[in-house]
Swiss-Prot record:
Enzyme Commission code(s) on record: 1.3.5.5
Predominant subcellular localization, coarse grouping: plastid
Native organism: Zea mays
Family per similarity comment: Belongs to the carotenoid/retinoid oxidoreductase family.
The protein's required cofactors: FAD
Name of the protein described by the UniProt record: 15-cis-phytoene desaturase, chloroplastic/chromoplastic
Amino acid sequence: MDTGCLSSMNITGASQTRSFAGQLPPQRCFASSHYTSFAVKKLVSRNKGRRSHRRHPALQVVCKDFPRPPLESTINYLEAGQLSSFFRNSERPSKPLQVVVAGAGLAGLSTAKYLADAGHKPILLEARDVLGGKVAAWKDEDGDWYETGLHIFFGAYPNIQNLFGELRIEDRLQWKEHSMIFAMPNKPGEFSRFDFPETLPAPINGIWAILRNNEMLTWPEKVKFAIGLLPAMVGGQPYVEAQDGLTVSEWMKKQGVPDRVNDEVFIAMSKALNFINPDELSMQCILIALNRFLQEKHGSKMAFLDGNPPERLCMPIVDHIRSRGGEVRLNSRIKKIELNPDGTVKHFALSDGTQITGDAYVCATPVDIFKLLVPQEWSEITYFKKLEKLVGVPVINVHIWFDRKLNNTYDHLLFSRSSLLSVYADMSVTCKEYYDPNRSMLELVFAPADEWIGRSDTEIIDATMEELAKLFPDEIAADQSKAKILKYHIVKTPRSVYKTVPNCEPCRPLQRSPIEGFYLAGDYTKQKYLASMEGAVLSGKLCAQSIVQDYSRLALRSQKSLQSGEVPVPS
């Protein structure tokens, strides 16, 4: 996982730039599209010499959260639990495999965790000085956290829910009311809700929520929408997979779904799911999400993590790995995959000159980074060649600290339905660690971001404030004549999750590569949850499962290599 640069501006206006993790010179901040950039601004000069808005006392929060839903009896949860038990119950290896895993995002952490559960020794290497990959976060000089993205944990994420249970940290998820709340662009400051009744089973609760909402779709539009979805309901998974070749917009025209359904529903869904608009997104992505949300009673119920992901989610996984003999190393950037004469992996060469060897190797980096690492000798192999179609989508995450508490918000995720913004939340309300009774901190996903990723931080903030003035007409003005900005952070990710455009599905690789002893993990690899945190965790489990299943072959290969003297002593 590569890093970018931290740019800052002091209150006198002097611009400063430095390498964020000490691994890239400033001039290389945007040399390649996979570098993530960070921007930090502090705007109020009167705060010079003291904390910008608050101190951090011992955490005391009156919890408004809802009880954890009963997920344990759902089929998907049980299947995910069965896969977890595969590792715990597998035969203990006579000689544990040493598996080198590159990338400590959720996919790499998951791979290492389940390999350790099976009795093997993972060596997890992270390029940056922070865990989490796409869920990474950083603490500023005031002690406030800012994140790579706005992360939501759904009830329909069975592998993540199992993972929280296995780590005994289920209480770190703050469950919210079972609703979806959309801003009304034509009625500034107003919202429309889809409330899922707790007393009804799926899919009736979802249908009820849609039918009860008369502010976004008319009855004729609802009927035509339902008729358009009938083939998916009847055809099941084969039908869903067959729609991979169509964009959402193309599917709507084919099914006779009114354009207003796109304007009122699908634009918001597309941007929330993949940070792009319906004229680009594969309809398969929408149908998979609808299937998960409608087929499981609590599938669309949302939870926030109670604090920053590196400490509250990633560190418990690291502790688990280390407690079972595994290793996790930060600041360990993969420079090159060195090969043996037969085309298999000899070792991972790090940027500091270190060579890391193992019995098996996993690349759990984002697809764009892995494509830069693919050895020339592998480039014409179909498995690797097909990856060219998989490209990360740009996204920008914006955090704004205001000088007051905003009233026109909820303790929930909100769909902005803005042309520039996707979803947002007042994190001072939704998250325990970020709780503040006096001032709001809005975290917003700025998407689609293709045209904005290279623009200045000032331009992005100005555009964001214009949109917020529509969402908070009585409280926010673009010129800050109402609520004042205390400070803000902008995190740019030029290449985030893979862009789920039509005809990508055949290009997604299995976790087991055609190169003996080499594997892939990441949400772009083949698994049923597409580009998501759930997909990343599941990909790691499937990768670890492939390695455990290949144990005999890998152990024999390692033994022969040692006897022939081809493999050096592990570093």
